[in-house]
Amino acid sequence: AALDALENIGLANAPKSGVEIMTGAGAILGEDGRLRFPRALVEDMLALAARDITLYGRDPKYDLELSGTRVYYGTAGAAVHIVDVEKREYRESTAKDLFNAAQLVHHLDNVHFFQRAMVCRDVTDNFLMDINTLYGCCAGTSKHVGTSFSDPSHVAGCFDLIHMMAGGEDKWRARPFVSNSNCFVVPPMKFAEESCITMEACIRAGMPILLLSAGQAGATAPAPLATAIVQAVAECLAGVVYVNAMAPGHPAIFGTWPFVSDLRTGAMSGGSGEQ
């Protein structure tokens, strides 16, 4: 069903660079501006896709081998508020909160990686927020880190910091210890142009990609969960084509992440059982 959706419906709003990359591999750009993906193209890209991926930590003892039946647990999300257990109040999250969370994860044996769990709301400049997010995560733990970038223009400056932490670009490329959590689609079945350009920059810089599709059943995805999953799989398969058309075998993780909407209010139900 997901392959049928890619072949017949396709995805809209790819950036110009993405259109060139994917049509060069065999995707078809329709007169309606949508990219469609023949079944054979998807199968070919899946054959090229990386299999036994290692997510490196700055300390090798925290390396994560993503193969076989191995299962790992970590943080996720981008919370903008936090419950302050000392002051007993609900407030905006800060850079210090992010650092504290990274330190906590570092000392929890059964939490294996740290994705940026909250937004540094006390840093108002977006570039400074991105670079302080990266620094706060890596300062708090030597486990593998996942982060995001709020604008494609911020990627280069953040990589200056990454190369500094790694001891040089060559050492970074040998053991990339940060991955890009990338919501490259805006469901239903549309690319997120700026996120795609960010993803391209991260691929060129050697950073693993977590391909995230976060549709909401009943809002940006069909209400029946089975069809919401079909949509999420189709969107992430489009991401696999995108990544491997650009850099065959580049480490990328299939991140279907369907949520559900509260149909009484229209709000996202982030902690729902459906997720």
Give the location of each predicted region.
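Helix-rich catalytic cores of soluble enzyme domains
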Residues: 93-275
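Acidic/polar, glycine-rich intrinsically disordered N-terminal extensions of enzymes
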Residues: 1-96
